[in-house]
């Protein structure tokens, strides 16, 4: 959990200093933010917890977060990070300065055909990317298409989107009536992709004509026009684009154009940039930018190994990983959209097939394409080694020393205070070895035996701690440490920089905030001579009850 702080009179959340309000929505404000260390600008959507609960839109918010976390495309707004406080969620997103396409059309009127085609090509590329990853937007409209400083289109607002499944039909009527397909406003079943095609047709018409094909202040009349599918085609539109519009705005979804049809249309293919529809979409640039890594090291005063470990950990919320992607994305934006392959897609089915990967010598695999690191074993070797023979030895995956515990970036004294509170609540008994090391026991009400464990707080790195759980036996005499400060751990837990804080709302919002990681990160216990029978299970139950209490 993050806390709001003041920075030169301005609100600071995490590493971001908030500035002016960009807009006000149903659930809260969108403010411009600046990363305190890298200086890059972001858009911060502030979602009030109480408001989203009262409006019953928790599912909508979850969908938007899940989808944006999944996507990496040059024409889809990126979600860098979600920061949680007791009162709000802060969605840290890509910032674009050009405003909405809707406002641009209202101000400038219809767009020249060449420019309209360029924007439409970008929009369709993004929609195709969504559909290939089984997501239907369902609320495409000029208000949800943003423009950057170079007049490139970016699709936003995935709150109404749905994941597609084979054989599944959607029936929910959602979105804006002017852009909704006939089957949506009629409440008929629809598969999903075809409703986005209709909306894209309406957007293309708005770009070319400066008006909407179906419009009326009287909603029943508007619905009648949409169901009829009759719209005016101005004389200045050339015949080629007119045929494309008529194909996209077919009332019968079975006769409506598909993305394949649009891509093959002669008007659409003119001046089509190759990066929008790569020939081999399974291949994304699996490279790490050394210059960006060095910049992160300078800004955060950390080592290259720490940055690499953060990227390989696969934790999208890691501060070093977030800063790296901010640098990469801002560089890409400055180069317009020419570096498409730096924005990788979610792993495809062919990723694990070595034959599908063609990595030039000397290039390191991009962390977004890497599976989680695993301990080396005869049956399970890290795919990282197979894909990257040039990986520095210092980053090689070694046989790890596993731990059972919780990782946190809260202050050490705050962590221990929460531990004492939880133990008291559970009726545990404890003995203080030092300020950060406890021996704890609990009596099993059934057997009458005591289950004992050691709790010790380790300093994993300069920003995070590990609260380690260790099973102990009556015969085991723990070595007492004379140190009164948390000790540095050399365990593999340091490779995973998942932040956690103990906040009352974490448990129910775990999937949104990612603020507490009370996970079991290993199963090898440190007991010198563990007893047979139920001792191990009693120990795990004791750990689970403490983790649950800490999460409340």
UniProtKB/Swiss-Prot annotation:
Record PTM: Ubiquitinated.
Regulation: Activated by phosphorylation on Thr-172. Binding of AMP to non-catalytic gamma subunit (PRKAG1, PRKAG2 or PRKAG3) results in allosteric activation, inducing phosphorylation on Thr-172. AMP-binding to gamma subunit also sustains activity by preventing dephosphorylation of Thr-172. ADP also stimulates Thr-172 phosphorylation, without stimulating already phosphorylated AMPK. ATP promotes dephosphorylation of Thr-172, rendering the enzyme inactive. Under physiological conditions AMPK mainly exists in its inactive form in complex with ATP, which is much more abundant than AMP.
GO molecular function, one term: protein serine/threonine/tyrosine kinase activity
One Pfam match: Pkinase
Keywords noted in UniProt: ATP-binding, Autophagy, Biological rhythms, Cholesterol biosynthesis, Cholesterol metabolism, Chromatin regulator, Cytoplasm, Fatty acid biosynthesis, Fatty acid metabolism, Kinase, Lipid biosynthesis, Lipid metabolism, Magnesium, Metal-binding, Nucleotide-binding, Nucleus, Phosphoprotein, Serine/threonine-protein kinase, Steroid biosynthesis, Steroid metabolism, Sterol biosynthesis, Sterol metabolism, Transcription, Transcription regulation, Transferase, Ubl conjugation, Wnt signaling pathway
Gene Ontology terms: cellular component: axon; ciliary basal body; cytoplasm; cytoplasmic stress granule; cytosol; dendrite; Golgi apparatus; neuronal cell body
Domain Protein kinase: 16-268
Post-translational modification Phosphothreonine, affected residues: 172, 258
Single GO biological process annotation from the record: cholesterol biosynthetic process
Coiled-coil regions, chain positions: none
EC main group: transferase
Cofactor (UniProt): Mg(2+)
PROSITE patterns for this protein: PROTEIN_KINASE_ATP (PS00107), PROTEIN_KINASE_DOM (PS50011), PROTEIN_KINASE_ST (PS00108)
EC number: 2.7.11.1, 2.7.11.31
Transmembrane region(s): none
Residues the record lists as Phosphoserine modifications: 377, 491
Deletion phenotype: Mice develop obesity when animals are fed a high-fat diet, as a result of an enhanced lipid accumulation in pre-existing adipocytes but not in other tissues.
Catalytic activity: L-seryl-[protein] + ATP = O-phospho-L-seryl-[protein] + ADP + H(+); L-threonyl-[protein] + ATP = O-phospho-L-threonyl-[protein] + ADP + H(+); L-seryl-[acetyl-CoA carboxylase] + ATP = O-phospho-L-seryl-[acetyl-CoA carboxylase] + ADP + H(+); L-seryl-[3-hydroxy-3-methylglutaryl-coenzyme A reductase] + ATP = O-phospho-L-seryl-[3-hydroxy-3-methylglutaryl-coenzyme A reductase] + ADP + H(+)
Comment on protein domains: The AIS (autoinhibitory sequence) region shows some sequence similarity with the ubiquitin-associated domains and represses kinase activity.
Subunit and partners: AMPK is a heterotrimer of an alpha catalytic subunit (PRKAA1 or PRKAA2), a beta (PRKAB1 or PRKAB2) and a gamma non-catalytic subunits (PRKAG1, PRKAG2 or PRKAG3). Interacts with FNIP1 and FNIP2. Interacts with DUSP29. Interacts with ARF6. The phosphorylated form at Thr-172 mediated by CamKK2 interacts with ACSS2.
Protein name (database record): 5'-AMP-activated protein kinase catalytic subunit alpha-2
The gene coding this protein: Prkaa2
């Amino acid at each position: 959990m993050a806390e709001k702080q003041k920075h030169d009179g301005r609100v600071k959340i995490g590493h971001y200093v908030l500035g002016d309000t960009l807009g006000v929505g149903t659930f809260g404000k969108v403010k411009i933010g600046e990363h305190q260390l890298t200086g890059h600008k972001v858009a911060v959507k502030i979602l009030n917890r109480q408001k989203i609960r009262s409006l019953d839109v928790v599912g909508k918010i979850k969908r938007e977060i899940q989808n944006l976390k999944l996507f990496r495309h040059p024409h889809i707004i990126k979600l860098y990070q979600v920061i949680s406080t007791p009162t709000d969620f802060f969605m840290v997103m890509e910032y674009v300065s050009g405003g909405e396409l809707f406002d641009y059309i209202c101000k400038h009127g219809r767009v020249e055909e060449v420019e309209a085609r360029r924007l439409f090509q970008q929009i369709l590329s993004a929609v195709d990317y969504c559909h290939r990853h089984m997501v239907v937007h369902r609320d495409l409209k000029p208000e949800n298409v943003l423009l950057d400083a170079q007049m490139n289109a970016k699709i936003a607002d995935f709150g109404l989107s749905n994941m597609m499944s084979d054989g599944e039909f959607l029936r929910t009527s959602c979105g804006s009536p002017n852009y909704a397909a006939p089957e949506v406003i009629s409440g008929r079943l629809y598969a999903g992709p075809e409703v986005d095609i209709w909306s894209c047709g309406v957007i293309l018409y708005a770009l070319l004509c400066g008006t909407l094909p179906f419009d009326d202040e009287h909603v029943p009349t508007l619905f009648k026009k949409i169901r009829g599918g009759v719209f005016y085609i101005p004389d200045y539109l050339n015949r080629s684009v007119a045929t494309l519009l008529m194909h996209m705005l077919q009332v019968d979804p079975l006769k409506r154009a598909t993305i394949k049809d649009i891509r093959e249309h002669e008007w659409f293919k003119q001046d089509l940039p190759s990066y929008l529809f790569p020939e081999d979409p399974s291949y994304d640039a699996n490279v790490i930018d050394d210059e960006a890594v060095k910049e992160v090291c300078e800004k955060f005063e950390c080592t290259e190994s720490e940055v690499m470990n953060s990227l390989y950990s696969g934790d999208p919320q890691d501060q070093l990983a977030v800063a790296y992607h901010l640098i990469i994305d801002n560089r890409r934006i400055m180069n317009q959209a020419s570096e498409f392959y730096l924005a990788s897609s979610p792993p495809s089915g062919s990723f694990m097939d070595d034959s599908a990967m063609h990595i030039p010598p000397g290039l390191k695999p991009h962390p977004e394409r890497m599976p989680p690191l695993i301990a080396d074993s005869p049956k399970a070797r890290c795919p990282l080694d197979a894909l990257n023979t040039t990986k520095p030895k210092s980053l090689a995956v070694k046989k790890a020393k596993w731990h059972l515990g919780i990782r946190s970036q809260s202050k050490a004294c705050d962590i221990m205070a929460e531990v004492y509170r939880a133990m008291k609540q559970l009726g545990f008994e404890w003995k203080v070895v030092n300020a950060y090391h406890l021996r704890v026991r609990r009596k099993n009400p059934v057997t009458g035996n005591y289950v004992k464990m050691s709790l010790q707080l380790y300093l994993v790195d300069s920003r995070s701690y590990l609260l380690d759980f260790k099973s102990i036996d009556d015969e085991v005499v723990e070595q007492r440490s004379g140190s009164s400060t948390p000790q540095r751990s050399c365990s593999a837990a340091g490779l995973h920089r998942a932040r956690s804080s103990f906040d009352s709302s974490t448990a129910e919002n775990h999937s949104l905030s990612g603020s507490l990681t009370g996970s079991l990160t290993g199963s090898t216990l440190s007991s010198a001579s563990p007893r047979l029978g139920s001792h191990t299970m009693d120990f795990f139950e004791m750990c689970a009850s403490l983790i649950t209490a800490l999460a409340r």
